[in-house]
């Protein structure tokens, strides 16, 4: 059965070929380059109106890079938007991707934020998906070069190999959630 799957977040979500990977479903992509947690909060009414049967989110990396927010501010913002989404869509399964690895400059902050949001998201009934662990270099807490679109700067954008690796890890969780949906 065709399901409505909504992706929401920043450029990392925006760049994913979700409809290609999920052709048997209706896919809406609310991923926008440069978006922050505040931007996503502004899109919540649109997300709700799209009537998702499954919501997949990744947001927060631009809060560090674009606005230089503190870890506390990023945690507060992520949890605020997660709480609002959960309140407005109490029965919709949500998969929340952790912040993904970037450069050395941000990696420790990403790890700290991920550790702090995970238990709260789980308490909200949101599935926490550890994208950081999937995309990080095995020897350092940065994005693995072979998954990086901009390897000279250890940037945050994924290349095709990065998206494929992420989706291969994410797709079983997507399928689990889709299988649990009751008509």
Predicted features along the sequence, with ranges:
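Hydrophobic positions in alpha-helices of CheY-like receiver
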Residues: 81-85
